[in-house]
């Protein structure tokens, strides 16, 4: 008999790469992700960002002060770890700095989507641990990092150290 994790691993292996994006480029995929997030109520401008790790060591990201429903492929910018814009209009959100720490800690991570869904934000303010109470949440069971203390805006290296350490392997 297979263990539960073995079943989960097998399912995700079979499901990987089943979506056909045709000839869509990375910027188009970022823009589509933003539109999907916006359609689900994630209308971030300052407190949410997406980054994608590129093979050349640079990153695609959404610019500061643009809501997810405003992002199109032309507004996606390419940056380096020094937050310098290498391609595209706009300024990177300083909060993406913590993404670099995660990418260094976890070579398997290729994309980070950081949002503040209203319901999740509300639940987090209760100070109570979240409980897996529905079968749709079971893939996250024992695979979530929880931070008891938070130093504030994630714009410095301290936040990246805390987050990447909490994620572990």
Language model feature labels by segment:
Residues 1-169:
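Glycine-rich flexible loops
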